Amino acid sequence: MASEQNSPDALLSIRSSCNRCRNHKLKCVVTEAPNGTACCQRCIRAMVPCKFGRRERKKRGSSPRVVPQSPWMHSPWETTSTSMQSIYPNTEAMDVGRADALVVHGTNAFPPPANVPAEQSLTGDHSAILTPGSMNMGIFNHLSLDANNLEADDIHAYKFPHGQLHEAHHTQYWHFQADEWRMDHPNDDSHSDYSATSSSKAATAALLQLAADLQERLDALENEPSWRRKNASMDKYPIGSVLQLSSKLQQLGRCLQTDDSSSTQSESSRSRASVGATSSVHRLQMPVLESGTSDACLNVSHLTSTTRFDTSVSLMLLSCFVTLLQISTGVLGHFQDYLHAHPKTRARTLSMSAAQSSIVSLGDLDPQQQTHDRIHTAIYVLLNSLEEVEEALCLPPRVRLAITLQASPRSDGSTSEQEKAMSAAFYGGLSAATEGIDDILTEFGRRVNDTKGMLRQHMDL
């Protein structure tokens, strides 16, 4: 017993979380096992042994005085004391020391905001510097990140300052303005590069989330039964969810665009930082389909426009666009199922009294086929949204499918050169990786034309 008390491990307390929950960073809920020992509920469900380790001894010794190394602790009047109960230093600073801590080599290292008086920069409350759980620095309250006082929305706004998540159709989407991702700092190239990199990473993360949402929506369309089996009417068909996904892709396409000036400025700053190093970001422009070409021959010359995309971003945008086309094709398939299940009905005529009345106007006539009119409107709304996505992705006008289907609709099911050359117009060197894109585009065009033809037959047009 004496040897056990004298051992160094005897003074170390047992952890309140088991080793398995600590490794996975999960909350450990401890319950008493039938044999009287404590066991974690997660370990009980996983049927694995539950072990509670002891806290580790500090590997570095504590010192009553610490030599300051940061600009906040360079003043000789500041002292830092360390206690065994807390790992955070307790900083006690005099007013002179606080004033010196804000001045580095005769200049104010952290200038106050424009709306704060200059004399307030030395009289603010700086006693909370380097205190546990807070970074309240008086005039620098706009930089404080006190997690105990912040709500969930505030923490999310700090992590994603330019975007907000909204719950719609059991999926989270991004809402932001396109100009918020572009930050111009002509006087500071390094700060401009940092801001552009941060906004690009956030937009790329939102693009990955959108790709997952599109795939989830496509799987739901392919696996669920036809809409006519659920409802006899198409009035409550959720067409807005598809339009919202299209709107998100359009916004991300505009946010991720770069131009030659920003690219040149970014590359020049990189060359100054590392002499002789080449840019690691490869830019790619969409090729143009020349007029008068046959068999969808393409010219891979660059566009006259300065809009460009990163190679990795352009591939993700292409994947999202193709998935959106597949979703639109599935929606048109639901419309066709409804038209097949409800055969053509003869239009009703007016009553004798209404037909002989001279005061009956066109607005007094009741619509005979409201559902068919709404389906027809939904088709053009889908095509308009796809046209806006094509513009946001900077597709050449000669290879845009949506505007072609609206301008010259065909009912014979033929395939145009635009549909055949779509994938090659995106990336001429990736034909092996984009073999199925032509089939998806052709199927979408055929489905649009077939649905329009069925509507014309049902509506006697």
Curated annotation (Swiss-Prot):
Where can this protein be found?
Nucleus
Q: Which Gene3D superfamilies match?
A: Zn(2)-C6 fungal-type DNA-binding domain
Entry's Gene Ontology molecular function annotations = DNA binding; DNA-binding transcription factor activity, RNA polymerase II-specific; zinc ion binding
Q: Which residues bind DNA?
A: 18-50
- Give the InterPro entries listed for this entry: Zn2-C6_fun-type_DNA-bd_sf, Zn2Cys6_DnaBD
UniProt keyword terms in alphabetical order: DNA-binding, Metal-binding, Nucleus, Transcription, Transcription regulation, Zinc
One Gene Ontology CC term in the entry: nucleus
Where in the sequence does UniProt note compositional bias of the Low complexity kind? Answer: 256-274
Q: Where is this region: Disordered?
A: 55-79, 256-278
What is this protein's function?
A: Transcription factor that regulates the expression of the gene cluster that mediates the biosynthesis of the trans-fused decalin-containing tetramic acid phomasetin.
Report the protein name in the record. Transcription factor phm6
What is the phylogenetic placement of the source species in the record?
Eukaryota, Fungi, Dikarya, Ascomycota, Pezizomycotina
Give the gene name: phm6
